[in-house]
Amino acid sequence: MVHLIVQLSKYIMIILFLIYTFLCFHLFKYPDKPKKQKHIYNLQRFYMFLIHLDGFLVLFVTTMDTKIIGFYIAQLVLFESIYLIYHKFYKNASELVLNNMVMMLCISMMILTRISFDKALRQFVFVLAGTIFAFLIPLIMQKGTMFRKLTWTYAGVGILGLLSVLVVGVASRGAKLSLTFGPVSIQPSEFVKILFVFFIASMLYKSTDLKQLAITSGVSAVFVLILVASNDLGGALLYFFTYLVMIYVATKKFYIFAGGLAFVGLGMYAGYHLFSHVKNRIVAWLDPLSVIDKAGYQVCQSLFAIGTGGLFGFGLGQGLPNKIPIVSKDFIIAAISEEMGGIFAVCLIMVCVSCFLMIFNLSMQMKDAFYKYVALGLGSVYALQVLLTVGGSTKFIPMTGVTLPLVSYGGSSLLSTMIIFGMIQGMYIMQASPEKRRKIDDKRRKDHETKNRQKQTAKEPGAQGSQQRRRKPAAGGKNSTKTQK
């Protein structure tokens, strides 16, 4: 009977998630029909909570652990509270971004509860903390006016944060990633990436001339080199490609992007010959079976899990996800694919794609250049993180140690991603608010007038001299007229 319930539930879950994913993209068909959009958002929430219920029902049936029921109810209360508060205070927030955030949190809670109830419980505590940030940040962004002026504060705090890990950080799997304070471990690079985006956005907002680009590139290189020195190659790639995308969009010069890609290729070639851990990862990527007992073990187990799970998976609780090293973090997509099915995993990736499209669309709509660059940078961080995680788990690219946002286990990753989503919502609210748009337009006009006055002031000595030279003959003419009279 239990086996029948598990098998039936996995097909129901896949069908529900297929419908949810279809609705994510079907929404783009109705950009100017708010009633139709609202109906689709409500349908999404309905299917989302059915998936959540289905997953925890299976987990309870397979374990008969009553703690799972209480845990499910606590999650349900939290997720409903998120909707109630957002609808109460942030009426102009993006419903799709909100739905997708909660959907991915639901999936995270299901798969982490399956892997380890203790880890799921700890992750839930971080979700509670992240929810507070997600509520406060849109309000702060609406009230704050100093974000574009803190350029060197972003750079200084970010570099110090990364240097602290390099100097006193705790090494994990050959890389220095975190700072430990008693039982609490923090990964600063997860938060510094937000400061990194704000630094580049504020620099590009001021100017995109050669001097400004050179300074931006130099400081960005410091961020990346510190990560390389810490052996955090995934973080270094994430930061570098984010920088590359933002610079390319700001300058619209393709040779910069092409040069950046060539630089990455040269860096990988040099790293292969200089660093053993880089060589091991590349060998494990090219031929994992040849080093299955060593560097290739993780990738092989991930591929075995994805392959044996097939399109429909074994069902929650029926696979062997704990055979995959670091399954709750780097290889979470392999565990999802094994038990929930390849179709479910692809749907999850497409939900991530819809999030990026919404963020990119927001960037295109923002009239304020600073926030346009911020939205683009945060969207790039999110998309690249998904690409690096999924690509590493499927042998598309070498493993980088990057986690899947909102789904993988890890407090720092979860909090930073919820902060990013809170910022995206804040920009959606700013963009949708007529009053805020008017203030931004007024500020942009005043800034433009100030720049024009500064240019006129720079030319003023020459202008005054010419005016005086013009006035002298006129003055002489008047005096001569008086004399003649």
Identify the meaning behind each predicted range.
Residues 1-17:
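Hydrophobic transmembrane alpha-helical segments in integral membrane proteins
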Residues 2-3, 57-63, 116:
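Transmembrane helix-loop junctions at the membrane interface of multipass transporters and ion channels
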Residues 42-48:
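Select subsegments of transmembrane alpha-helices in polytopic membrane proteins
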Residues 65-294, 334, 338-392, 419, ...:
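Hydrophobic alpha-helical transmembrane segments of multi-pass inner membrane proteins, especially
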Residues 232-237, 312-316, 326-329, 397-400, ...:
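Transmembrane helix boundary and interhelical junction motifs in multipass membrane proteins
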Residues 288-329, 333, 343-344:
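TM-adjacent membrane-interface loops and short helices in multi-pass inner/ER membrane proteins
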Residues 22-41:
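Membrane-interface helix-loop junction between the first two transmembrane segments
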Residues 389-485:
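A juxtamembrane structural motif centered on a specific transmembrane helix
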